[in-house]
Amino acid sequence: MPEPTFHELAQLPPPVLRQLIRRGDYTGHTSGLGQRHLQANLVILQKSWADEFLRFCALNPRACPLLDVSEPGSPHFARLGADIDVRSDLPRYRVHRRGQEPVEVSDIGTFWEADFVAFAIGCSFSFEQALLDAGIGLRHLELGRNVTMYRSSIATRPSGRLAGPTVVSMRPLKAAEAIRAIQVTSRFPMTHGAPLHLGDPALIGIRDLARPDYGDPVPLAADEIPLFWACGVTPQAVLAEVQPELYISHAPGHMLVSDRLYDEL
């Protein structure tokens, strides 16, 4: 049986897509998948870090809009889907150990610990369908690429040991489209809301748009403006500063596709 095309994957209901991912049959990015369903960034921490991180999310709701939190030791997000198992239902994960480079894997069952707490954080992939419905084209989708992401100079609000830069995702748009995109995305605070910045990237510490820190580069036309949204990769940048002994995250662009519709929250 031939592998499904990306267009065919985009038509799959979330439970079917997750089954495909769970079997290891798809390990690519999830931008453009799930259609109108919420996608979530993932952070998994040992319980000793959980309260601190929960407060960090509360202090930084633009970057870390919290969709759900698991019980200690549970790999399930009951609010997001009845059969979700965070150990296997994302296409790619990063396992971070203090003093070591992250390891990318497609299943974290062998790394799971009894005191792990999982956090689902809203993702801007969720509002991309609303932008498309408004007639706003998205370059990374047109090119079949992951979204472009950068570490910015915008500081997060600290919580105990947790402090660091805000990561932003970028989408290039023409001026009229940019105005409409701000109007559309401001309706979705649980998926990062309106952009944090538009225009000159140097004002938020980004030196070269062609060299993203995460994701894939996309070209910017002469008549386009770069728009920057807060991004759920922010926790990875912050946790890299303090280096817990062990934590797990999604690989940037490889999200959990939930059963919830993006406009339900």
Curated annotation (Swiss-Prot):
Transmembrane segments: none annotated. GO terms for molecular function: lyase activity. It comes from the Bacteria. InterPro entries: D-Glu_cyclase (IPR009906), Putative_hydro-lyase (IPR038021), UPF0317 (IPR016938). Its EC number is 4.2.1.-. Belongs to the D-glutamate cyclase family. NCBIfam families: PRK05463.1. This is Putative hydro-lyase PA2116.
